[in-house]
Structure formats: structure tokens, C-alpha cells
Amino acid sequence: MVRMAERLAENFIPEANQRNENEPAYSRYKRVGQNRSRLNSRASLGSSMGRRITLIETDSGVIEVESDKQFLDAFKDANMDAVHHLNAASPVTRGLWCMIIIAFVILVLVQCYSQIKLYISEPVATNIEAEYPSKISFPTVAICNNNQFRLTYLTGGRIMNRRSKSISGSLLSTGHDVESVFDTVLRKSWDMDAVKFLRSAAHWKSRMILGCTWPNGTSCKLSDFKAVWTTTGLCWAINTDPHNPYEVTGSGEGHGLRLLLNVESYERVDACTKHFRTKTLPGLKILIYNQTDIPDSSMNGVNVPSGYSMDIPFKMQHRSKLTGVHCIEENDEQIEASTDFNNPENIRTCTLRRYMTEVENSCHCTLRRAYTSNSTDVKMKACNVDQYFGCAQKAMQRIREEGTASTCLPPCKSIDYTAWQDMNRLPQNLMPALIEEQEEDDEDDVEQEELDENVSFSTVSGGETFSCEDSAYLDDKQVMRIKRDAHRAYEMQARHQEDIFLRSRRLIARLRNAINSIERYKWGWHYDTFSGVADRLSNLTCFSNFSERHRDIISILESRPITSEEKKANQMFFLLDETAFNRNATRYMSVGDLKSRYGDKVDDVAEEIAVILRIMEKLWHVFMPDSYIRTMTGDFSRMDRIIELMNQYELNKLQRRAWAEKMQSRQMKHFFEDDFYESYYQPLIKDLDTTLVKQIDEVEADWPKVEYYLQRGSAGKTGAIMFFGDGNKDNRQKFEKLIVEMHECASGKMRKEAGKMLSSFKKSYRELQAAYGKLFKEELPDYLENFQFGNKFVGDNFAMVNIFLHRMNLEVWSQDRTYGFWSLACDIGGALGLFLGASLLTIIEIVYLCIQYGLCGKRARNMKCIPMDALTRQMKKVATCSCCKKPIEKSREPIYKKKSQSYQRRFTADDEDQGDKFRSRASSEESKRRKNIWAQMNDPSGNSTLTPSEIKNFLDQVQRNSQPPSYHDDHHPEDHYYYNDPNYLTISPPSDRPEDNREGSTSGYYSSPRAPPQANPRDESPIPDTEPISVSEFSDALAPPLFKTPPRERRTRKEQKIDEEDDDKHSYV
């Protein structure tokens, strides 16, 4: 009992000896005031006053101690580890354990936060399984050309010759300029149906797909390819039947779909146009997808450039994702709706329908007819070409930039194909090899080819070719069609592609400007466009009237006979010794005779004569008009034909290829370098350079000697004797005047004018030569190389593709959640157990106790009473009782007969009789002492409090006088304690009961019931509705058990009821 008092003091009494108003109070209650239930263990009872009530039963009676509840009571009652140390006497101990508990609580919170964060992130594990079936369904393969529009269709007669409706207002797709042919195309076709226009402008499968072989070696048919529309253009797909897909039985290159494709790079629109220009590189896109899928764009395909043989291995992955924000689990309705494009339940067409909806909302027209044939339910009109290029393309571009991932989720179960590329060079014998190039003799033999699309075969041969029939990839019909299509495309490129068209136009303009420059400067090859050197020099006064002023001299010079040896000796003799010559003019018959007489003087005279004759001869050629040509006498008809062909090409009357081939004929090819050079350039350059400029330069070189001769007077004498035959003074003066005048004119104005004429002619001819060579020696021959269909053509236009399964296996990818709710609960429970020694059930219990302490008491105030049987079963009755009075029960048989067999062996009827006899032998003195002690319990001030020392003294007295007194007062029966009936309890000392140490006994005191006497029923006050007694507060293995003793008759009724329900229970009320 002392230890129990200490436990009471430890839990309810503060450390300080003096109690203030905030300390918990301990009260004594009358038994009449409240009725309490009894439980065979320590108990904590929640009351309606928000207090904790503890009941202690001793051998002398029952003690009730109550106090205000504290926050730690819930943790203590929930059996959390180390919480009881927070009430330790030492502040150091309390602080240390408080820090430890707080640290562990923080660790628990951190761990719980990390686990909750992990749970919210929804981690997923992906499991990969490999299957090796004997047959695998081959996927759908779609071929998409990066070029969406064919040049030959846009610029062909079907569009350019079409009559469109009148335009009201302005077009959305183009401005008002008419310079670009593609703007003209839009004006010509603005009212056409956009889907029809796009399909006609796309690459045809008959032109793009030249060969196809299934994995089993059989050839494909063009009818096996179906049109597949995407937002980036039209594609051609094979193996599209989802119910009957092609199956392969092996993997590797030998089990692939082999394709020979024509990229048709010559059909690309590289012109500077807003809507038709190809913005991607030349090549193809290969799409590999499941038959149930619908591609929305070709940009995600495998790129195949031209000029290579591509091996494209792929692997299949069956993916099964978890339903969530990334995918949708397809139900039966959605699967059935997969064949209806416009069905909102069709998740496979959601992306395309999103594009179409945006087009319809923005442009008030629809393009659904391209994707589904069932468009009768669409009330909106179809988009025309102007609406497509002016509005629909912009609307689809907005959706492409915004993305559709948030509005259109893919199905969770799908088949993905991962492909890669192996690049190799194309074979050399793809196209027939050219053996001999065709070359016509003259341009008249070259004929134009008919470029109408309805013409099946080419009419012009490009030369003799050779191909091995056993290894030929293309037949003759395909080769001829490719050449014809390429010819037509190259022709359109040359006329409408800015870089080619502008370059050709500028080269033609340059040649025409060179010809115009020659004609402007009167250097042309026609009579009306040519002006000779003499005519040009006649503008000089010193040259124009030279013949009139020196007519007599000119006549003498022109009629001067040839000088003989004798006459030459006489002339030299005259110059050497005029006096001797006058005496005997015929003295010397040869120059040798003169040398024998005059020695070296003969050589000086001979040199002077040679200088005078040379200068006079040169000047004579310079001043004589007959020295220059007056008209061009060559055949320049071919040059005129060249200009005519050039004009025809500019007027679109001559094809570029025909023009180039005509210019490459034998006669045309070498005309400019041979005939034109000899008949035009050589005569003019002779007059200007040889006759005029060079002669004047040579005269200037020898003129210093002539000037020396003039100064000493021998020049006039020599000239007079050489040209006039008489060396008199007049002849001398005429000659000197003539040679000086001719030199002054030639070295002055004539020389300057001759330099200008020569420079002008050379410049004009060089420009003509450069322009002619650039156009006819470079541009057109390069253009003709396209029609050789050799390695350059093959590398620019062809590609080979082999699509095959990399390994004969399937990868099945499935996703599972790796961290669910139960994993979170287990981790949080583990963290609680590791750091706090608690569990989730402990947390729930703490919450429950907190609610019980704070809320249940308030609810209990509204209850009138709780039957005693409910309290006995530790249950709280929610419904209130109208009356707690119960009828008197019948006497029951001895309890030992209702107990188990072991109980009956320990307790018999003799034991009950012996107890009755013992109770009747109580002494009066001891009864008085007990009355004095227990009188304190009957104090009218039942709520008076006791100090801890008073409680200790009181408990010591109770222990010494544990038997309660007997009261017999018939006048005040309401003040009797219901347990003061001396006939009810029998107290046996421990020494008389050897069975006290038996199994199941918890104390040296026990209560032995006997059959109750017949008594009248008495009224009982209502029992307050209290909480069930919790077995959780004061447990001590060495302390006596705690009992709560009710009145005998109520105890008998309750024990009988409990015995009937469970014979193994030892606690009763």
C-alpha cells in the first residue's frame, strides 16, 4: 500500500511541498454521492468534468483520487517509450530526455516527409521481358518525300491554262505582284479544292516507287501502297491492313522490305516563294508504325538522303504503361471507335482532330476529307487553295508549336519501333551506262521533245546505253519515263527557279549587251553596223584631206618604178658626191664599185636610205585608205542563228535542252572559235593593230634618225632622189615638208585615235567572247550533263532502302508502381518504431485519447445515466437512460457452481459458511477504531482536499485498519455505504488461506460471496454516464490488486450475468 501511495504521489502530486491553486486536487467522495464500477486492475476513468479518476480498493474499502488531465497523459496511456521520463524529479533528466525525444521526432518527421514525397512522385518500375515467337507481324512502312509540291505540276498546263473564278477582294495567300510564277499559280488555282490540289501536286507513287520486294522475295504491286495523309503532306504506306498484316519468319537483311526509290530531286521547288519552297533537305522520310496507329507528321521518320543505299534495322517494343497523366487506358468503346476518324472516343485520331478543329475554327472550312471518306456529317465547306495557304497552314503551325500532348494522350498499350541507319554507296549500274553520246552535225538536226505529261515515251534519245539484263534494276520503260520526267522538270527549273532562271537570263543579257556594244561602236559584222578604220580616221583633218593636198606627190609615189641595182648605185653615188655625179652619173654601175671608192661611207648612205624608205612606207600605209577594210566580208549567218535561238528561248519557243543541244552540234560548237574569229576578229585587229598602231609605233622608233638626217640636210636630198628621181632644191623641200607633216599627224592625233579604236574593239570583243563562252561553253553544257543520267544524276535522285527486323524477338515493357500506399505505411511505421518505439496504431491511439479527453467528456454531460452492466463490460452507452433503477434480482446459486472446475475445486460451500462465521466474530473495540478512521470518508465536506502527507498518513491507517466498520442506523439509510453490510464481505487473514498463493490470486485479501438475503428493493440515485475504465495507469507487480466494491445485491446480479457470459472472467461488479 505504501508503494501504491508513492505511485499516486509521483503521478498526481507536484515536486514542491506546498500546493498552489494550479496544482491538481485530491478529494474524498462519499459513497452515497457517486457510484463507481470496479475493475480488477488499475483504472483511469474519464469524467464529464475533464478530470482523471483513479479507484483503489483495499481490504478496508475504496479510495477515489482524481486530478486534471495533462497533455502527456495521452502519450503515457498509449505506452510510448521514454515519455514517463519527462516527469522525472531531476531537471537534467527531463531536459536530456526531452532533447532526445525531440531529436527523434524530427528524424521521424524528416523520414516521413521524404517517404511522402517519394509516394507523391509515384515512382514506376519498368519490367522488360523478351519473347521469341516463330512469326512476327511486320509493321506498316510509309514513304514520305520531303518535297511536298512537284514543280512540273505547279508550272504545268493544267494550272497555268486554267480559268479560275473572278477574285472578289484580295486573296489570303498572295499579294498583287505578278512577277513570281508561283503567285500566278495561286491566282490560277485559288478556288480549287485544297485536298485535290495537294494530292495532284504530291509525288506520285508510280514515279517515286520504282521497285519493291517483300521479305519473302516476291515483288510488291503499286496497288499495295495506300495514301496516308499527314499534316506535312501525302505519304504512301504499305502493309496497312490491321486484320491481316504481313508476317516475317526471320530477321536480318535477307528478311527485309527492299525498296528502290526515286527522290525526284529535279521536282524540288527551290524558288524563292513563300508557300511552295521546300525547306527541308532533299530526301525521303521512312515511317515505321503499327497498323492501328495514325501518324500525324512525317518529321519523326527515318531520314533517307539521295545517293545512298540505306539499311534500316528496327526492333519492336510492346509497351504497357500505367494509366495516369501520360496515357489513357483504352476501353471497349474507344477500341470500337478507332475506325471512325470523327468519333471523339477515338484517341488515335485525337491529334489530327485537334489540327482539324483549329483549322475549322480559324478558317471556317474543313480539311477532314483528306483523312476520312465519311465527311458527310461535316456541314462546313471544304477549304480551297487560297484558304489552305492563307489560313490553314498558319493554324496547323500554331498547333504544332503549342503541342497536343496535354489534350491528346496516347493509349497506354502501344507498340513502338526503334530504327537506325546503315549507309552505303549506291550501285554503279543502277541506270544504264552511256556508251556513246549523241552529237548532231548541225543544229537543224536537233528536234525538240514533246513535254506533255500525257506522252508516254521520250522522242529524243540521249545516246547509246548499255545495261546487263540479269542485274538491271530498271527496265527500258522506266528508264525512258524517268528521263522524260527529268527533262520536263529540268525545263521548268530553268524557267521558274530563280537561281537557274536568273543566271540564264543574266548570261543571255550579258551576251546581248556585248553584241549591242559592238554594234554601238560600229564594230558589228553587218554592213549597217560596221565602220572601218579609214572611215573612223577620216574624222581627223590631217588624214581626211591628205590625198587632196599631196595629190601630185601621191601620184609620183604610187607610180614610182622598181629601183634596179644600177639605179640604186647611181642614187647612192649622188648622195655620196653630188659634184662627181654631175660630171659622170654612170661612173659606178654597182654598189660594190662605190664601196671600192668610198669605203664605209657607202654603208652610212645605205642605212640612211633604208630608214627613209621604211618610214615612208609605214607612213604611206597609215595614210592610205586602201590599207584598211571598208566592210566585213565573212559569213556571219551562224552568228545570226545563235542570236535567233537565244531569242526563241527567251520567248519560250525553244526548250532549254534543245537550245543546248543545238549549240553543241559540231558546226555550232566550233563556230565562234574558228569561223567567227577568222572572218571577223582577224581583219579588224589587223587594221587596228598591225596596220595602224604598230606602224605608227615603228615610225616613232625610227624617227630620231630621220630627225637627225633632217637637221644635217641629207634627209630631203635622200628623199628627193629616192622618190622624185631628182634631187633639186624644190624636191628636197617637198619631201621634207611631206615627211614632217605625215609624222606629225601619225604621231599625234592618229596615234591617239588608233589607240582608242584598238582598245574599244578589243574590249568589245573580249566581252562578247566572255559572254559567249559563259553561256554556250559552261552553262548549257553543264545543263546537258543532267541528261547524261550518269553517276551525278543517280546520286542526286535515287535511293535504296532495306527495312528489316534486327532480331527475331519482341520486347515487352510493362510498368508497375514501386511505391504504393502500403509501402508508405510500412516505411512510416518502421520510422516510428525505429526512432520512437511506436507504431501507426500508437499514433491512432494517441489521437483517440486526445479526442477522448477533450471531446467525450463534453458529450457525457448530456447523458443521464449509464446502466451498471454497461460499465461492467467497459462500454460507453451513447444513448441516455431514462432511469437507472433496476428490479430486485432473484437469489442466485453460489458462485463457485458457476465458475470453472478449477474454481470449484478451490472454493466450496464450506468456504462461504466459514466466511460468515468469521465476520460475526468482530470485536467492538476494533469496530470503533475503524469507524473513527472511516469517518473521514463520511465527512460532509467530501470535496476537501488532502496534502500529500495527509494522504500518506491516511493510507497507513487504512492499511492497519483495513476492515470497514459496520453501521446500523435505520433512521438515516441514505447515509449508509452500500458496501458496509457486514454480511456481505468476509475478510480472511492470509495465514488462514493457504490458497492465496495459488494461480490466479493477486492479493492476500479476497472476497467470498454468499447467497444474499431477501430484501426489499431500494431506490438508487442515477449513475453518471462516465467513460469506461481504462486498464492503463497504476500497475505494480508487488502492489495489491485494485478493486471497486459495489453493494452486495448489485454485485450478485452482475456476477451472475458475467458468469453466464464468460466463466473464465475473474473480475465482476
From Swiss-Prot:
Family assignment from sequence similarity: Belongs to the amiloride-sensitive sodium channel (TC 1.A.6) family.
GO biological process: sodium ion transmembrane transport
Keywords attached to this entry: Glycoprotein, Ion channel, Ion transport, Membrane, Sodium, Sodium channel, Sodium transport, Transmembrane, Transmembrane helix, Transport
Protein name in UniProt: Degenerin-like protein del-10
UniProt-listed Gene3D superfamilies: Acid-sensing ion channels like domains, YojJ-like
Compositionally biased tracts (Polar residues): 938-948
A Pfam family: ASC
Compartments, record wording: Membrane
Parts of the chain that traverse the membrane: 96-116, 831-851
Record region (Disordered): 898-948, 960-1069
Main localisation: membrane
Record topological domains on the Cytoplasmic side: 1-95, 852-1069
GO MF annotations in UniProt: ligand-gated sodium channel activity
Basic and acidic residues composition bias: residue spans: 915-928, 967-978
UniProt-annotated glycosylation sites, renumbered to this chain: N216, N290, N374, N454, N539, N545, N584
